[in-house]
Amino acid sequence: MLTAYERGEATKVATRQLGPALAFERLWQQTGCRRVIGDLAGERGFQFDLERAVFLTVLHRLFDPGSDRAAEKWRHGLVIDGVGELELHQLYRAMGWLGDELADQSGRGLAPRTTKDLVEERLFALRNNLFSELSLVFLDTTSLYFEGAGGHSLGQ
C-alpha cells in the first residue's frame, strides 16, 4: 500500500483519527457518564443510542468546539464506536433532552432544573462517599457579565 502510494498508483487513501475517542472513552466510562446517561435515557425509550449522541457532542466540544451540525461533520474523520448511524436531528434531540425541564423543581436555583442537573447529581453521588471532601469548586464564568464604575485597569 505504501509503495503504491509513493508511486502515485494508489487511487484513494483515507485516514481517520482514533486517539480522541480512545482516550476519552475510558474517562467517560470510569467517571460513570456512560452508565448514568444510559440509565436516564432508558427511561425515555429513544429510538437511537442517546448516550452515544451525547458522547459524540461532548467529545466534539472538547477537541474541536462547534455546533451540533459541526459535530456531525467532524465525526466522519474519526473512529468512534456506536456513532456511525447517528443523524443530525438525533444530535439535536440529545442536546434537547439534556435541557428538558424536570417536573420536580425542588431545590431549584436561579434557573429551572433540567435533565443535565440530574446527570450531574448522579455523577456526584457515584463519587461521593463518607470520606469525600469538597475542597475545590470550578465555576464557568464565560457567560457572566459585570457592570459598574472603576476597574478600567483591571485587565491590564
What are these regions (language model features)?
Residues 1-155:
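Dynamic "connector" segments at or just before major functional cores
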